[in-house]
From Swiss-Prot:
Binding-site positions, L-methionine: E57, Q100, D237, K268
Phylogenetic placement of the source organism: Bacteria, Pseudomonadati, Myxococcota, Myxococcia, Myxococcales
Nucleotide-binding found in the keyword field: yes
Protein name: S-adenosylmethionine synthase
Region (Flexible loop): 100-110
Length: 396
C-alpha cells in the first residue's frame, strides 16, 4: 500500500432503509434474548413503502409480539407520518419465522463444547489513527451521520430520517493529514429551500462533526449534490438486513469475511468472532505491540476450536509478529462459548449496534471495545513468547 493516498469511507443514518432493517432484526433478537438467553435467532428484514417483512429461523421458549416491535422501532427512528413516505403506525407487517434446522442444532447445541454456528472467516481491525483506535475515514463519516440525526431531532425538523455521509481522507507518510472531500445527503421535507439545506448541513452538522485542523481551503463539500431528496427512506429504496456490512465495520480499511451481524445471536460466529477479532486487534494496538493490526479467525460448522488464526501488523509491529500471534492464542479463548462468556454477549444489547457502526463505540454495552483488562497480559505474553523454528506464524 502506498504511503501517500486518498481513502474514502461512508456512513448512513438510522433512517436509511438498510439500517431500518438491521435495527428491526436486532430488535427482534434483543426481545427474544432478554427472555430466553439461550435462544437461537437468525432474523432478516425487508422494508419497502408501506411494508415490513420479518423472516428467519428462531428456536425459543418465549413469545415476542414481533409486529408491535417492528412498528415501535420504525416510529422510534422517526418514520411517524405518511408524508415521509413511510409510517410505522400504519405500515403492513408480515412475519415468516420457522425453527432452526435440527442439522445445525446438533453441532451447535452441545452442552460440553458449543460448536460454531457456521463455517466462515471473520476479521478484526484496529489502528492508532483516532482515540477509539478506528480508521479516520469511517470514524469521521459516522461522526457526521450521528450529528445529522441529532440535529434532526433537536434543531431542524425539516430534516427527515434518511441520510448518508462520505469522507475522503488524505494520507501522507501513511498518516491522516487532512480531509479532502465531504459528501452529505439528507432526506428533507418538500418546502425547505436548497439554500437552507446547504447552510444547515455545513454550519450545524459538518462544522460540529469534523476537526477544524483537518479542514482547509482545498477541502471539497458536496451537500445533497442531486439537488432534492424528498422521497427517501423505504419509499426511495428497499431496505434489507445485512447490506451495510462495510459501514458496520471499518469502512473498507480492514477486510471483511462477508457475514453480516444484525439479527444473529452470539452462537453465530459471523457476529461473535468478528467482535472478538476487533477486541484482539484493538488490544494489540492499545498494548503498543503495533500501530495497525488485523486478525483473521476461521471456523468449521459444529467445531468449537477455530480452524485458523492469523495476525497481520502491516510492518508496524514493535515485537516480532509471530510472538504477537502466539501471545494472542495464549491470552484469548476463541471457542464460541468462550467468546460469548468473555464478552458477555447473552444480553439484549444488539439494537444499539445496528446504526453508526459496531466498532469504535464508547457505550458500556460494547464490551469488545474494552481492552484494559488484557492489555498488560498480552504485552507480557508477546515479550516472553518463544517462536518455533523462526518462521512467521500465519495459522495455528
Amino acid at each position: 500500500m502506498p504511503t501517500d493516498f486518498l481513502f474514502t469511507s461512508e456512513s448512513v443514518t438510522e433512517g436509511h432503509p438498510d439500517k431500518i432493517a438491521d435495527q428491526i432484526s436486532d430488535g427482534v433478537l434483543d426481545a427474544i434474548i432478554a427472555k430466553d438467553p439461550q435462544a437461537r435467532v437468525a432474523v432478516e428484514t425487508l422494508v419497502k413503502t408501506g411494508l415490513a417483512i420479518v423472516a428467519g429461523e428462531v428456536t425459543t421458549n418465549c413469545y415476542v409480539d414481533i409486529p408491535k416491535l417492528v412498528r415501535s422501532t420504525i416510529c422510534r427512528i422517526g418514520y411517524t407520518d405518511s408524508s415521509m413516505g413511510y409510517d410505522g403506525n400504519t405500515c403492513g407487517v408480515m412475519v415468516a419465522i420457522e425453527g432452526q434446522s435440527q442439522d445445525i442444532a446438533r453441532g451447535v447445541d452441545n452442552k460440553k463444547d458449543q460448536g460454531a454456528g457456521d463455517q466462515g472467516m471473520m476479521f478484526g481491525f484496529a489502528c492508532d489513527e483516532t482515540p477509539e483506535l478506528m480508521p479516520a475515514p469511517i470514524h469521521y463519516a459516522h461522526a457526521i451521520t450521528r450529528r445529522l440525526a441529532d440535529v434532526r431531532r433537536k434543531q431542524h425538523p425539516w430534516i427527515r430520517p434518511d441520510g448518508k455521509s462520505q469522507v475522503t481522507v488524505e494520507y501522507r507518510d501513511g498518516r491522516p493529514a487532512r480531509i479532502d472531500a465531504v459528501v452529505v445527503s439528507t432526506q428533507h421535507s418538500d418546502e425547505v429551500s436548497n439554500k437552507k439545506i446547504q447552510e444547515a448541513i455545513r454550519e450545524d452538522v459538518i462544522a460540529n462533526a469534523l476537526p477544524k485542523k483537518l479542514i482547509d481551503n482545498k477541502t471539497k463539500f458536496f451537500i445533497n449534490p442531486t439537488g432534492r431528496l424528498v422521497a427517501g427512506g423505504p419509499m426511495g429504496d428497499s431496505g434489507l438486513t445485512g447490506r451495510k456490512i462495510i459501514v458496520d465495520t471499518y469502512g473498507g480499511m480492514g477486510r471483511h469475511g462477508g457475514g453480516a451481524f444484525s439479527g444473529k445471536d452470539p452462537s453465530k460466529v459471523d457476529r461473535s468472532a468478528a467482535y472478538m477479532g476487533r477486541h484482539i486487534a484493538k488490544t494489540v494496538v492499545a498494548a503498543g505491540l503495533a500501530r495497525r493490526c488485523e486478525v483473521q479467525v476461521s471456523y468449521a460448522i459444529g467445531v468449537a476450536e477455530p480452524v485458523s488464526v492469523m495476525v497481520e501488523t502491516f510492518g508496524t509491529a514493535t515485537v516480532p509478529e509471530e510472538r504477537i500471534a502466539l501471545a494472542v492464542r495464549k491470552t484469548f479463548g476463541l471457542r464460541p462459548r468462550e467468546i460469548t462468556e468473555y464478552l458477555n454477549l447473552l444480553r439484549p444489547i444488539y439494537q444499539k449496534t445496528a446504526a453508526y457502526g459496531h466498532f469504535g463505540r464508547t457505550e458500556k454495552e460494547f464490551t469488545w471495545e474494552r481492552v484494559e483488562e488484557k492489555k498488560d497480559a498480552l504485552r507480557d505474553a508477546a515479550k516472553s513468547a518463544t517462536p518455533s523454528g523462526g518462521r512467521r506464524l500465519k495459522a495455528v
